[in-house]
């Protein structure tokens, strides 16, 4: 490990080689895109059985699940359904990118601002520079540099995982953009309705 620039946090070196980090990234990815009813323990079982990448898990078959320790027919069906209820539908590209952890501390809201201005930036080989990203509200130079540095890695991930269908929102004009404020408890169904 090493200290970060501010000397306040420790950064793990060789993240790609650390089993715990890889399992946590897999769990984070599927949780971020909305897969339910599958916990960290099950993802760990998949990982240890050789389904150690997002690609392998999204392509897992019911028969493969039955080979996992403690998984019977009913459980394999439930797991398979939980995965495919999400991955077979359109998913917001921002959720996919956030879930990959490629951009570490850059989340959904920042990515959403970018895709509103440049909808195909992450899918296609579109040229973009630092100044164009900084023009977007809330994006500072450090964030823009991080995005530019990881852009090819994100595009490569999306090419490899081409079975994902991206949800796109097309606005007719700028007046269609609404600012919605929710007070009190944030109900998941209300948030999904607003996002849809």
Language-model features, listed with the residues they occupy:
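Compact, charge-rich alpha-helical regulatory domains located at protein termini
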Residues: 32-41, 48-72
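Long, low-complexity intrinsically disordered regulatory regions enriched in P/S/T/G and acidic residues
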Residues: 1-11, 63, 74, 149-150
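DNA strand-break repair and replication-stress modules
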Residues: 22-25, 38, 49, 69, ...
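Cys/His-rich short segments
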Residues: 1-36
């Amino acid at each position: 490990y090493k200290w970060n620039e501010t000397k306040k946090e420790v950064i793990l070196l060789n993240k790609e080689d650390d089993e715990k980090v890889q399992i946590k990234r897999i769990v984070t990815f599927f949780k971020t895109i909305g897969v339910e009813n599958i916990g960290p323990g099950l993802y760990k079982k998949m990982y240890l059985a050789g389904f150690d990448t997002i690609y392998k898990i999204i392509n897992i078959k019911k028969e493969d699940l039955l080979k996992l320790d403690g998984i019977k027919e009913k459980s394999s069906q439930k797991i398979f359904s939980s995965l495919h209820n999400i991955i077979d539908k359109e998913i917001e590209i921002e959720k996919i990118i956030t879930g990959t952890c490629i951009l570490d501390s850059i989340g959904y809201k920042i990515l959403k601002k970018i895709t509103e201005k440049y909808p195909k930036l992450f899918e296609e080989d579109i040229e973009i520079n630092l100044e164009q990203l900084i023009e977007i509200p809330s994006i500072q130079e450090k964030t823009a540099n991080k995005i530019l540095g990881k852009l090819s890695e994100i595009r490569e991930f999306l090419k490899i995982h081409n079975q994902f269908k991206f949800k796109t929102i097309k606005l007719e004009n700028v007046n269609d953009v609404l600012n919605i404020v929710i007070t009190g408890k944030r109900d998941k169904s209300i948030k999904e309705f607003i996002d849809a």
